[in-house]
């Protein structure tokens, strides 16, 4: 197997490394001391079109793949930005793949372009206080309510929730005792991060202060039916 980069991959790596290197060690040292999302760093990558590297062209992306996106993220981390820089960008790049793969066309047109352009930020809310990495045991519950769902529960170690406009939220819509397999009965929502219904409480850390980590306390969050999707258990013949 040939692990050498082709010309296009090398160009992506070189260009993004050069761009990220405009933000030197002093910039990241200051961010790590005082905290605060690296808005200018994020905006620069958005302006140059890199946030859509792995998204289809029809939604404003570059139409490339996960390999190219990974090379970009490696270059960002190598530049001195480390995990702070990578974590500031990764949700926009990778996080809405479920929308691309499983959302309907109206949802893709509505949700993907603002994230690709950097006009919206999102966080990914899966991990819970008492479930660790066993995602099937999560307790956050979404209950049908008229034309949508009402969500209650808690999440932990959720990055960028202090600055996010949207949240990609994994919930249980059928109790684990009532499903054939623990991977069933899970529903993924992409919706507004309504701070009247979601308390975002930052967790103090010893490092990586440029990107906040948080606990979320969700109390009666209403999600319209139009923004939900339930296709989390893929058919065995489906390739992703």
Show where each model-derived region lies.
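Cytochrome P450 C-terminal beta-domain/meander region
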Residues: 134-152
